[in-house]
Amino acid sequence: MTPGKASTGHYPRPPRARAVVSQLKKEPNELRRKMLFLGYLTDRLDRKSQSIYLVGGQAVETYTAGQFTTGDIDITSTDRETTEGILGRMGFKRGGMVWINEALGMAVHIVDMIPNRTEKTRLIRVGPFTVRVVGIEDLIVDRLAAAKLWKSDRDAEQAQALFNAFVRQIDMKYLRKSAGEEKVDLPRPNKKRVSVPEMTPLLDRMRAEDA
């Protein structure tokens, strides 16, 4: 699937939003529950030839299967109005800059229209759905930039963890170029590299592929 474009195949009628919420409440794994929610939201937007991308801290949580947790689910959307309409039908209420669903324990923040870069976007399959997640390379640079700007040790730690876990999959040429543009220094791999399966066991059920 091409990032930012919907499939042109025939779609069966989607389940009603309330029915989806009812099913999500039954999912005991918090990360999987979030990903199923995002998958449903992605599916509804795809039907209208629009897209959402998972970015920020929730993308880090997803790639690390919960090693780093976050509060808000940060997404970008090519159609904010439609996205907000779907959230409303799912029982989310707007509170300032975020949409909150207390029953699901979720808060969604629509941060922009589209990510700055989409060429390294990954597709993660969960249940019957597919979620677009910002690429590892772009996420590492994003965390490094945040660490530099805010002098944040946590963001630097996240960048290091992502780099160590996915070092064999990273497009180093692309990463170096992006880091240079943002004027950030790349982390050095630790002597003991953490393998992706060790670090992200949930991804055994949420298969990541190049978009």
Where do the PLM segments sit?
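Compositionally biased terminal segments of proteins
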Residues: 2-211
